[in-house]
Amino acid sequence: MELWFSEFHTPDVKHSLRVDRHLYSKKSDYQQIDIYDTPEFGKVLTLDGNVMLTERDEFIYDEMITHVPMAVHPNVQDVLVIGAGDGGVIRELVQYSDLQHIDMVEVDPLVVEVCKKYLPKTACRLEDPRLTIHYEDGLKFIRSRQEEYDLIIVDSTDPFGPGEGLFTREFYGNCYKALKEDGILINQHESPFYPGDAAACQRAHKNIVESFPISKVYQAHIPTYPSGHWLFGFASKKYHPLKDLDETRWNMRGIPCRYYTTTLHKGAFYIPAYVEELLKHVEKEY
């Protein structure tokens, strides 16, 4: 008998993956955690029945949420990552030799433990000496920080359950205070395609625009995420994601990527008309 994993993207749409083995299943204090082994996408991590990553396409998300700000900010030394218990963002960040310290705040220790065991290619750099892992609520952690970070990356789950508070105006305001005077905030912005996801995307962007002087949106195409069309938010106190992009400086680093390039960086900020329409009432002009 064939085993399939299915995730509903809307009440009328579901995405299914054939499963070879169900490797892990446990409910933590925060959420249901499962690992599946699939023939097409390799190992798959789901939280509360929602795909968080697959071995085959996680590089797209992790490269785009990490390297876009790193190619813009001229001197990132201190980074805060909220979420990211799978380790993919950390794997990308530690390739920057001049980065001095990373605080990673993950509410669920079991996510980190499971990913270290079952997703070693993603969680392979969680022992880097520059990394400090804090197992606590990101909402509470950020409230006590003042002008400490050059970059904050919010690699949260979807805007419900444990990750719900990471999309609020209060949270983005606290991120602003935690950033240095030229700091950048990056967050995953959900998909703009299905109406329910689009509404969450619009709310999150509105809250960011009200907190930061520079707020833009960029995109990537991730096969296993709802609709495959995914947005990220770029919010900054000083730097513009295109005007301040330093292609030469970033390319000289020689960081190997499978998705991100500085050419793609520029194109990613040119969003489709339907997304412009969704965000036009809250987007600022620069």
Give the positions of each predicted feature.
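Short proline/glycine-enriched turn/loop segments at secondary-structure junctions
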Residues: 220-224
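Glycine- and acidic
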Residues: 50, 189-190
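Acidic/polar loop patches that form or flank catalytic/metal-binding clefts of enzymes
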Residues: 187, 213-218, 242-245
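Conserved beta-strand signature within the Rossmann-like core of class I S-adenosyl-L-methionine
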Residues: 182-189
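Rossmann-like AdoMet
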Residues: 1-63, 67-69, 95
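Conserved Class I S-adenosyl-L-methionine
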Residues: 172-173, 198-219, 233
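SAM/dcSAM-binding transferase cores
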Residues: 1-34, 227-286
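The AdoMet/dcAdoMet-binding core of the Class I SAM-like
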Residues: 2-4, 53-182, 194-201, 279
